[in-house]
């Protein structure tokens, strides 16, 4: 997560907002809460959401939303943000949906951060197909995290960088 800190620790981000889709137990949420003025943390699993709240109980700039982003609803309940951080399902269809929904909730000039980019080929394919489809409105800003060849959780080897940051317009 050091790359997130490097990218967003500048004072200009202190007044900005981030939408974190799939906050799990709140570890990344904690980092984001120190970088941004407002954090909206989305999680479908009630137990994980409660863990995230407990882990971040001293961080008062986090709002939690319990929502299954794949339950057929669009992200209508979610606010517009300067950054959207996604660590959801990793299959092609889900990633494509996440990216399409992200730009509906992203300010121009904002960023989409995709976690686990180098672990799942379907995620990587969906990202690159989406970039092509957006015809210049989405560009690769930078790759982040562990590099190709690194060993990740459960011994899985990265086939590319751990994460990717996309710039919108």
Label every PLM stretch briefly.
Residues 1-169:
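S-adenosylmethionine/decaboxylated-SAM
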């Amino acid at each position: 997560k050091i790359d997130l800190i490097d990218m967003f620790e500048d004072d200009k981000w202190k007044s900005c907002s981030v939408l974190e889709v799939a906050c799990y137990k709140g570890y990344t949420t904690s980092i984001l809460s120190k970088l941004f003025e407002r954090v909206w943390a989305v999680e479908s699993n009630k137990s994980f959401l409660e863990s995230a709240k407990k882990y971040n109980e001293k961080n008062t700039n986090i709002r939690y939303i319990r929502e299954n982003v794949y339950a057929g609803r669009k992200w209508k309940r979610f606010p517009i943000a300067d950054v959207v951080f996604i660590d959801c399902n990793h299959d092609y269809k889900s990633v494509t949906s996440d990216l399409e929904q992200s730009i509906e909730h992203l300010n121009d000039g904002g960023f989409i951060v995709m976690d686990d980019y180098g672990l799942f080929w379907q995620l990587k394919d969906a990202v690159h197909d989406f970039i092509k489809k957006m015809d210049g409105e989405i560009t690769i800003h930078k790759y982040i995290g562990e590099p190709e060849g690194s060993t990740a959780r459960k011994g899985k080897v990265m086939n590319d960088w751990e994460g990717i940051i996309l710039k919108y317009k």
